[in-house]
């Protein structure tokens, strides 16, 4: 999901 990607990005 996009949310998971954002969290992993940070």
Curated annotation (Swiss-Prot):
Q: Which GO terms describe its cellular component?
A: extracellular region
Q: What is a biological process (GO) this protein takes part in?
A: neuropeptide signaling pathway
Which compartment or compartments is the protein found in?
Secreted
Summarize tissue expression: In larvae, both myosuppressin and myosuppressin(2-10) are expressed in the CNS but not the midgut, thoracic perisympathetic organs (tPSO) and abdominal perisympathetic organs (aPSO). Myosuppressin is expressed in the ring gland (at protein level). In adults, myosuppressin is expressed in brain, cardiaca, corpora allata and thoracic-abdominal ganglion (at protein level).
Alphabetical UniProt keywords? Amidation, Neuropeptide, Secreted
Q: Which domain of life is it from?
A: Eukaryota
Q: Which residues carry this modification: Phenylalanine amide?
A: 10
Q: What does this protein do?
A: Myoinhibiting neuropeptide.
Q: Per the similarity annotation, which family is this? A: Belongs to the myosuppressin family.
The entry's protein name is Myosuppressin
Species = Delia radicum (Cabbage root fly)
């Amino acid at each position: 999901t996009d949310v998971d990607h954002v969290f992993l990005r940070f």
